[in-house]
């Protein structure tokens, strides 16, 4: 083997080693929006209805496994090394369902045969914005509607909310802020669900 060939081979080997080293130095971190199961149940009586949490609508640019964060006023970054365990829409539905089941003391029958002797409240959530600024804050803007399939004319309650949650630390703190924002949203939906079940004249809970 000539000197130039050996030198070329060494250069290629060094390049491969550096590439493998770079890959090894950047582990992928996975996150979930579902809060820990050890949270206390609601002190209120169990709701006399089941719920059906429908798939959550999410802006197309956010509905992926890679975390998407804001940079300044108009920039975004797609973080391939900071990822959700499932696409964001699935994570949001799972997190919302978990919160509502705990707060209402009921069951989410999505994907199951509907109970015969219990009304089922359908809940639909559409995320309009979910902006995350690392080291700063999370802003959530969403619309939701709820209604009982048994109601005549399909009457539903439709509401809107905007939330902001501080996120002063790293990516784990950013995820925690998003969990808290979803929990706050679930609290408002819970109030409206209980109110709507008692009276179809119930309006949306005012924002604090």
Where are these regions (language model features)?
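C-terminal motif of bacterial Sec signal peptides marking the signal peptidase cleavage site
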Residues: 19-22
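C-terminal/domain-edge helix-coil "capping" segments
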Residues: 24-30, 169-208
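Surface-exposed short loop/turn segments
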Residues: 24-41, 47, 103-152
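Bacterial N-terminal signal peptides that target proteins for export
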Residues: 1-12
């Amino acid at each position: 083997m000539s000197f130039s060939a050996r030198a070329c081979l060494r250069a290629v080997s060094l390049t491969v080693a550096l590439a493998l080293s770079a890959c090894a130095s950047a582990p992928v971190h996975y996150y979930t929006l579902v809060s820990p199961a050890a949270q206390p149940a609601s002190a209120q009586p169990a709701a006399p209805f089941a719920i059906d949490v429908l798939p959550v609508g999410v802006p197309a640019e956010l509905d992926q496994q890679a975390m998407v964060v804001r940079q300044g006023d108009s920039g975004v970054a797609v973080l391939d090394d900071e990822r959700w365990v499932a696409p964001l829409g699935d994570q949001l539905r799972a997190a919302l369902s978990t919160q509502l089941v705990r707060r209402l003391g009921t069951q989410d029958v999505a994907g199951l045969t509907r109970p015969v002797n219990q009304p089922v409240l359908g809940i639909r959530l559409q995320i309009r914005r979910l902006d995350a600024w690392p080291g700063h804050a999370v802003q959530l803007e969403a619309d939701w509607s709820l209604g009982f399939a048994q109601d005549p004319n399909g009457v539903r309650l439709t509401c809107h909310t905007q939330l902001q949650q501080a996120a002063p630390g790293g990516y784990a703190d950013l995820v925690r802020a998003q969990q808290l924002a979803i929990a706050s949203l679930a609290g408002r939906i819970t109030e409206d669900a209980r109110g709507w079940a008692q009276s179809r004249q119930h309006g949306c809970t005012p924002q604090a």
